Structure formats: C-alpha cells, structure tokens
Amino acid sequence: MLSFIIKRILWAIPTLFGVSIIVFMMVHLVPGDPALVILGEKANQAAIDALREQFGLNKPLIEQYFFFINNVLHGNFGTSIMTGEPVMHEFWQRFPATVELALIALFMALVLGISVGVLAAIKRYSVFDYSSMTFALAGISMPVFWLGLMLIYIFSVQLEWLPVFGRLSDVYYLDGPTGLYLIDSLIARDYGAFVDTIKHLILPSIVLATVSTAVIARMTRASMAEVSKEDYVRTAKAKGCSSFRVIFVHTLRNALIPVTTIAGLMLAGLLGGSMITETVFSWPGIGKWIVNALNQRDFPIIQSMSLIIAMMYIGANLLVDILYAFIDPRIRLS
C-alpha cells in the first residue's frame, strides 16, 4: 500500500509540472494588461511601468515562469496583483466556505443519487424507473445558472423563505476556529446563527447537488443492472439469501465501485470551487474568487489555483484507488 501511494505521488510531479506550463502560457496569452486593469486606462505610463516592475510583469515569460515555480517549491504562491495580499492567505480565508458548501452538496448527491439509482434498478422498466431517469437526464442537461436564478426568484423573491446571497445574515457574527459556520455556530452555542447558516446553504447546495445527483443516480442504476447479472448474485439467490442481502450486500457493494470513482472526482471539482453557483449566490468561496481573478487578470491567483485544483484531483484519484480495496477486497493495489 505504501509503495503504491509513493508511486502515485511521484507520478503526480510531472503531471503538475505539465499543468503549470499549460496554465502559465494560457494565462499570459489572454489579452489584457493587469496594470491597466488596476490603474485604469487613463493612468500615466510611469505608473504602469512601476506596477509592472513591482510584479515582474516586464520580465521575459520564461523568467516569470521559473520565478513562479521556484516560489511554489518554497511554499510561496505569490501575491495578488489586485489586493497585494499573499495568495494563500486569501485562499485560506475563502476555502472553508467552499468546503462547507461542497460537503453538504456531495452528501445530498450521494444519499439521493444512490437511493434513486437503487430503487430504479430494483423496479427496472417501471414507471418509477422511467420517470426518475427522465428527471436525472433533465438534471444533467439543466443550466446551473438558470436553476440558481429560478430558485432565487421563487424561494427568495416571491416566497421570501430563504436568503438570496452570502453565508450569514448581518445580525450574526462568527469567528470560530474552523471557518465552517455550521460547526463554529455550534461551538459558540449560537443556535440562531446555526439555523441562519442552514438557510443560506439550502439553495446553493441544491443547485450544486443537482447535476451530481443525476449523474450518480444514472450510474448507480446502470452499475446495479450490470452487477445483478453476475454469477455470484445468481448463486446468492439460489442459496435462498433474502432480497435485502442480495441487493445491499452482494449487488450494491460491487456496484459502488464506479460510483466511488465519480464521487471522488466530484469532490475534487466541488472543492475546486463551483464558479457559476458561487457567483450566482455571491458565495464567498474560492469559485467566486477565481472568477474575480479572471476578470481582473490577476495572474498569481489564476496560476496558483490551477495548480492547487490539479493537486485536489490527483489526491481525489489516489483516495478513490485506496477506497477500492475496502469496497472490493479482490482489488490489489500493488
């Protein structure tokens, strides 16, 4: 197991190196000068040159790249051009908001998606099967921004049941150790803030979970249908095992292997920040932060976050491979 993990980490190094080159070139090929974005079109040339000198934007691209890589290897991801704050300082300020939203959304997607997929597989070719898979297809096809705007219009504007944006109402203040408001509000015993946090989480988490739920439901159904044809499932039925044991012990456990793969990648994507959802709901996470950085040509943030998100995907893949061994003992990581 340890040798497998070490090999995967070593293989990740050239992957990250390739990602860094591609992202660096793409960022610098995009039209626009960060100095002009910050100072405005009417800024004098001396001020523009001074700002470009401050952030090293006047140096050759190859020199800028190796300067960036050298800093990353020393744990320095640079300084934001717009705010002057260290990139990692701003990242850790926003990451808890994204983590909280991502975990809630993934939990909802796994519970609903697997449940619907299992029921659809059990009641194959029934009305429930056709209707649930139709809704799943609609969920995959539905534009995220449209769904977010519709939920805001119905539940926030018309019914006034839920807040429109943000993580917490202005009447509450939390400064806990985790940055996760659900946990920090319980630590502080501020139950009003806890309820308010849940209200703020409902709409964005539903939007974020919709596509994931649909994908997991369809994959669970397909995997269950395939596994149910295996010899060991037929043997379990022939031995007189109960339907519950056949479904949840022999069929579902093996059907979860492809679901685990997609769930791991979903988690990495959600932790990387859902840009559209966070922007629609003004959620103060890293997704909205990256969108702002793209609009403002903030190269250090874009480059650093691309590397960090790539690390998340590599870590998620490694975690999924390790989980395989627990789900199916026949799999040998070595």
Where are the predicted features?
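Hydrophobic alpha-helical segments of integral membrane proteins
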Residues: I9, L51, L61-F77, V87, ...
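Membrane-water interface at transmembrane helix exits
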Residues: V23, V27, P31, A35, ...
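An internal, D/E-rich "acidic patch" concept
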Residues: N58-I114
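N-terminal signal-anchor/signal peptide hydrophobic helix marking the start
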Residues: I6-L16
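Alpha-helical transmembrane segments of integral membrane proteins
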Residues: L2-S3, I13, F95-F128, V144, ...
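Hydrophobic alpha-helical transmembrane segments of membrane transport/permease proteins
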Residues: T15-F66, F155-A193
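Short loop segments and helix-boundary regions at transmembrane helix junctions
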Residues: L119-M142, L147, V157-Q158
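Transmembrane helix irregularities
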Residues: V30, G139-M142, L271
